[in-house]
């Protein structure tokens, strides 16, 4: 929006074994995992963020026109999505410290930060849950999801019918024993690129509030027994008519 860059790549990744070794226990140790534990996702996702037509200049518009023409010439215009996802708004999150110190229960540490961001988004843009097709958090897991929904109900906002968590969607709880669900930077990124954006492109979802969640800890702070604050930034994603239409 400010015009500092015409085109930016944003990507994130995570790896199960590296996260276990750094923040929990070596895999060969064979420790028992509590049910509140999430399973770090080995995955990644990358999106390209472009400026709008007002800021992108002639080169950007020409590139879009060439891409559309190439699809038509190749007989693949139907492969181009009907709607192009765009960032229509953002709500920066604030650090929320709930005095959590258990690295085996990250969902509880991050849930209230997600609540704070969602409520702030409602206040900033004068919106309510029904204004969104989905409100999607990052990696709260099953434990964090229940905490989130409880706090939202206490605030007078019931989002249970439209809430989705990337960590829960990543794995099948019936066939994959990942306890509370998935976690990690790659979890939100992979679900965003592989599931959420295609839904917007197909026109099934018109407006989505995407709230990736994070826990602020390091190997040193964890070993010292310090608190694990949480943070969550919110991005509103909407579908606009594609340039190829």
Map each language-model feature to its residues.
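Short gly/pro-enriched beta-turn/loop segments at secondary-structure junctions
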Residues: 3, 41-43, 127-131
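Alpha-helix capping at helix-to-loop junctions
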Residues: 5-6, 14-17, 54
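Claisen-condensing/thiolase-fold acyl-transfer catalytic domains that form or cleave C-C bonds
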Residues: 1-5, 12, 72, 76-82, ...
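Condensing-enzyme catalytic core mediating Claisen C-C bond formation in acyl metabolism
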Residues: 22-119, 124, 165-168, 207-213, ...
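Short acidic/glycine-rich loop or secondary-structure boundary segments that cap or lie
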Residues: 18-19, 56-57, 97-98, 142-147, ...
């Amino acid at each position: 929006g400010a015009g500092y860059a015409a085109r930016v790549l944003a990507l994130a990744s995570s790896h199960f074994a590296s996260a276990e070794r750094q923040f929990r226990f070596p895999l060969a140790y064979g420790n028992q995992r509590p049910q509140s534990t999430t399973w770090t996702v080995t995955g990644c996702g990358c999106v390209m963020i472009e400026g709008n037509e007002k800021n992108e200049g002639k080169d950007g518009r020409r590139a879009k026109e060439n891409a559309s023409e190439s699809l038509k010439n190749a007989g693949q215009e139907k492969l181009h999505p009907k709607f192009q996802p765009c960032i229509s708004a953002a709500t920066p999150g604030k650090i929320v410290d709930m005095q959590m110190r258990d690295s085996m229960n990250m969902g509880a540490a991050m849930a209230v930060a997600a609540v704070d961001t969602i409520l702030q988004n409602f206040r900033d843009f004068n919106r309510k849950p029904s204004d969104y097709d989905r409100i999607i958090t990052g990696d709260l897991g099953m434990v964090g999801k229940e905490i989130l929904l409880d706090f939202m109900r206490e605030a007078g906002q019931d989002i249970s019918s439209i809430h989705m968590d990337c960590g829960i969607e990543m794995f099948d709880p019936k066939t994959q024993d990942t306890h509370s669900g998935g976690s990690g930077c790659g979890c939100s990124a992979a679900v965003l690129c592989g599931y959420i954006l295609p839904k917007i492109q197909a026109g099934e979802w018109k407006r989505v509030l995407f709230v990736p969640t994070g826990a602020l800890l390091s190997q040193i702070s964890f070993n010292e027994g310090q608190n694990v604050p949480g943070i969550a930034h919110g991005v509103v994603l909407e579908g606009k008519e594609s340039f190829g239409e």
